[in-house]
């Protein structure tokens, strides 16, 4: 997926341009293919497992097609994906809208945060100084990645897109959710990759509506500093 993203962007650079550290600075790829790893892990699990997706849903969708029996082993999926209250195509969905449609239509409960809420989780000057002033190996690497991201996107301060989904695993009350059904558009050109949300109290999908942005940022900083 790293290489695929770069190849896609060479042809048509999207507004949400992905960037990453050089390949040599990233952890080595696991020898087992991601799809096989998912299937084996889920089939061998003694209890239900919670999945987290912060990129394209290609591997999850492929695993569901290859081994439908894993559905009963997934209790729910947390995802940074989509945009539910404004008509924007979000990067993780547009990388593979068909995969996203398969996952959202699978019957698995999904708790998703989209651009509607992640764009509110923005660092301020003090947060950035704190990050850049730290000297631990982890935070040095995060500083390097943050500078690369800001340079690529043109933003002065980083936005906690994917980290918000991770924080939600730790504290669900950080985001006000709305329950309903998500439909991923895979027809036509203009709407391809849009995530359409229909409110329904009985729905198995929950999407973020409001976020306690300051608490999210503080939690992220706290965890990174304590770990790093």
List the model feature ranges, each with a label.
Residues 15:
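Flexible, glycine-rich active-site loops centered on histidine and acidic residues
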Residues 94-98, 104-106, 110-228:
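Conformational coupling and interaction surfaces
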Residues 11, 31-32, 71-72, 135-140:
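Short hydrophobic/aromatic-rich motifs at helix boundaries and adjacent loops
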């Amino acid at each position: 997926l790293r290489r695929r993203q770069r190849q896609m962007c060479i042809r048509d650079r999207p507004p949400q341009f992905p960037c990453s550290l050089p390949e040599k600075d990233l952890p080595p790829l696991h020898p087992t293919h991601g799809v096989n790893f998912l299937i084996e892990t889920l089939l061998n699990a003694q209890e239900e497992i919670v999945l987290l997706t912060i990129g394209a849903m290609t591997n999850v969708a492929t695993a569901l097609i290859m081994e439908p029996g894993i559905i009963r082993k997934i209790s729910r999926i947390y995802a940074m994906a989509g945009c539910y209250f404004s008509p924007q195509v979000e990067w993780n969905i547009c990388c593979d809208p068909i995969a996203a449609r398969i996952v959202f239509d699978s019957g698995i409960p999904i708790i998703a945060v989209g651009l509607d809420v992640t764009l509110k989780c923005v660092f301020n000057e003090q947060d950035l100084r704190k990050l850049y002033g730290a000297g631990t190996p982890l935070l040095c690497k995060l500083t390097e990645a943050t500078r690369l991201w800001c340079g690529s996107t043109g933003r002065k301060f980083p936005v906690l897109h994917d980290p918000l989904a991770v924080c939600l695993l730790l504290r669900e009350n950080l985001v006000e959710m709305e329950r309903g059904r998500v439909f991923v558009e895979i027809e036509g050109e203009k709407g391809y990759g849009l995530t359409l949300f229909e409110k329904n109290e009985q729905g198995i999908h929950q999407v973020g509506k409001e976020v306690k942005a300051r608490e999210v940022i503080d939690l992220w900083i706290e965890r990174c500093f304590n770990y790093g």
